[in-house]
Curated annotation (Swiss-Prot):
Top-level taxonomy: Bacteria, Bacillati, Bacillota, Clostridia, Thermoanaerobacterales
Annotated organism of origin: Carboxydothermus hydrogenoformans (strain ATCC BAA-161 / DSM 6008 / Z-2901)
Keyword Isomerase in annotation: yes
GO terms for MF: diaminopimelate epimerase activity
Name of this protein: Diaminopimelate epimerase
HAMAP family, sorted: DAP_epimerase
Gene: dapF
Length: 274
């Protein structure tokens, strides 16, 4: 099986093109992703990403996390597959439509390996995120291991709990991340973002991804952070989101789509023996 190793700010993926040859159609993708993503016994990645034929878009993207679970959407992965598709199939076409479990996502391939993505409008209704609260899911108290946090829940096609803190230096991500991810308030689990505000135009973020753990970057997470920060009155429309792997640039006007801009890098290509 031929593959590409790609990453968006260190959030890395094994990318497999199944558009013309569906070699994996009868494979257990959950088991395969666990093996491929293992950093000692496999290739090593945060997820396995497949490009598949689509009847309603340029192609379909599926993302299987390193734990074998399937994600609805991934902002870093969508940038990677958009760059790959344009370079492989249609260099003249810069604006794409990609079918995902979160709906049709619209990336635009720019110069210098940058990709701008229309992430769609954020979902803010509790039952649609989903989060088990009756009220608007803004600044909701949550206690884990005796530590009280306040989260704002946002869905960018996948659920996020955004937590603003005074300093990220005090946050033990590996300690609190998995407990918040699996908290009963989140029926489908959740991604978790801890956020330190540097200015109305710049934030620093640690990410705990549902199904992948601590990652160097998260595109939907960066988008959710800016949405939550705007709702709370902390942030302006254009924000640089500084992640461990680098910066993403997010734009959100109330009532409109969120736009994310960031890099997509090809590291190497190879063959994996099934």
């Amino acid at each position: 099986m031929e593959f590409l190793k790609m990453h968006g700010l260190g959030n890395d993926f094994v990318v497999v093109d199944e558009i013309k040859n569906q070699n994996l159609v009868n494979k257990n993708l959950s088991d395969l992703a666990k093996k491929i993503c293992d950093r000692r016994f496999g290739i090593g990645a945060d997820g396995l990403v497949l490009l598949l034929p689509s009847e309603k878009a340029d192609f379909k993207m599926r993302i299987i996390n390193s734990d074998g679970s399937e994600a609805e959407m991934c902002g870093n992965a969508i940038r990677c597959v958009a760059r790959y598709y344009v370079e492989k199939y249609n260099p003249a076409k810069k604006q794409l439509e990609v079918e995902t479990l979160a709906g049709i996502i619209k990336p635009e391939v720019l110069e210098n390996n940058m990709v701008r993505v229309d992430m769609g409008r954020p979902i803010l209704k509790p039952q649609e995120i989903p989060v088990a609260v009756e009220e608007e899911p803004v600044n909701i108290p949550l206690e884990v291991l005796g530590q009280k946090f306040y989260f704002t829940a946002v869905s960018m096609g996948n659920p996020h709990a955004v937590i603003f803190v005074d300093s990220l230096a005090k946050i033990e991500l590996e300690k609190y991340g998995p407990l918040i991810e699996t908290h009963p308030l989140f029926p489908r689990k959740t991604n978790v973002e801890f956020v330190e505000i540097l200015s109305p135009a710049k934030v620093k973020v640690f990410v705990w991804e549902r199904g992948a753990g601590a990652t160097l970057a998260c595109g939907t997470g960066a988008s959710a952070v800016v949405v939550a920060g705007r709702i709370l009155g902390h942030l302006q429309e254009d924000v640089e989101v500084v992640l461990p792997g680098g910066s993403l640039f997010i734009n959100w006007v109330f009532g409109e789509s969120v736009y994310m801009t960031g890099p997509a890098e090809i590291v190497f290509k190879g063959e994996y023996f099934l």
